[in-house]
A protein has these predicted regions:
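Terminal substrate-recognition subdomain of acyl/acetyltransferases
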Residues: 2-37, 42, 46, 56, ...
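A short, internal acetyl-CoA/4′-phosphopantetheine-binding micro-motif in the GNAT/acyltransferase core
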Residues: 53-59
Length: 123
């Protein structure tokens, strides 16, 4: 399909491979040459999920949820708490109670975490 003109891409989530690009600190998936991603910062005890990005032709197809699940499953497998600075991830966590146990106590002070990360040059 011609994604350059904004034509929506057909997507089967079962065929989408999400990878953890640790060098770039992001979970990513590429569909029809278009990259979707969630950026993060990893700390010894937590994973700060910063931003989710899905190109317009792929919006509304469940790709952001697929990326979010991959990030949260990674956090669980590595015994990391999650700090969701990204509004999409925060909303996802409110809707999916099965991931509530991953929330960091710092979740309630997202602004202070964001400021701390920014002031230390991590954001």
């Amino acid at each position: 399909m011609d994604t350059a003109r904004g034509v929506r891409v057909e997507l089967n989530l079962d065929d989408v491979v999400v990878s953890n690009n640790q060098q770039s600190s992001r979970f990513e998936a590429t569909v029809d040459g278009l990259r979707s991603l969630i950026t993060y910062r990893r700390f010894p005890d937590r994973l700060v999920l910063q931003h989710t990005e899905v190109p317009a032709p792929l919006e509304g197809k469940g790709l952001a949820a697929r990326l979010t699940r991959a990030a949260l499953d990674f956090a669980r497998a590595n015994h990391l708490r999650v700090v969701p600075l990204c509004p999409y991830v925060s909303s996802f966590l409110r809707r999916h109670r099965e991931y509530q146990d991953l929330l960091s106590p710092e979740r309630s002070s997202e602004d202070s975490v964001a400021l701390k990360l920014t002031s230390h040059g991590h954001a």
